[in-house]
């Protein structure tokens, strides 16, 4: 079996039916023309935010990470492992792709520890066991994995989806594409940066050009590039016409170098 390609989905994509249609059309075409197994990892911040708003619950973030109190983890897990995950499974079904919905703890695919007590139920993902997902891939299933995990002592944790995808890529020895709302990492003038090294990222963070959630995304991509020993792509799901080229290894956003 070829090494898998992990596609991490996030941002407001889950709220955009036209974009989901284009994305799944590109996935179908890729699966038909390549024997390479695919895995989807997803967050769903927009789904969580809508639910929190409907329940009149405050949304707090610290350094780009969602603060998750004990009384909110059940709601967030329901939104991500439930609504967001099943929405993607429904799109896969519509496009005749046999898919399986998972969370990080299934088959110990990704291990999770608590990141910081101040953040509450927020986890740090670490490589786990490839056994379950490899079994699914060998049988032509598309695993769709939410970014909810569980600690060794059974505590549910909300994990940043970029970081979750990175840990799963390390588990499977997979290539990784991080799809987001933006077309890549932008410089101070709003221009896309084609390639990014750790030194350059540090410089842009110090200058306040890379901020908030993008810091988390860039650090996850740098971690992945180092762990995997190969580049990681950050690109936008908005450019549907370019997705086939991206899946084939052509950079269309920012390529993060190890």
UniProtKB/Swiss-Prot annotation:
Q: What's a Pfam family in this record?
A: AA_kinase
What's a single GO BP term from this record? arginine biosynthetic process via ornithine
Reactions this protein catalyses? N-acetyl-L-glutamate + ATP = N-acetyl-L-glutamyl 5-phosphate + ADP
Subcellular localization is given as:
Cytoplasm
**Residues at which substrate binds:** 44-45, 66, 158
Binding-site list for ATP: 181-186, 209-211
**Which pathway does it operate in?**
Amino-acid biosynthesis; L-arginine biosynthesis; N(2)-acetyl-L-ornithine from L-glutamate: step 2/4
The EC number on file is: 2.7.2.8
The site (Transition state stabilizer) lies at: 8, 217
Role this protein plays: Catalyzes the ATP-dependent phosphorylation of N-acetyl-L-glutamate.
Assembly and partners are described as: Homodimer.
Family to which the UniProt record says this protein belongs: Belongs to the acetylglutamate kinase family. ArgB subfamily.
Q: What is this protein called?
A: Acetylglutamate kinase
Its organism's taxonomic lineage begins at:
Bacteria, Pseudomonadati, Pseudomonadota, Gammaproteobacteria, Enterobacterales
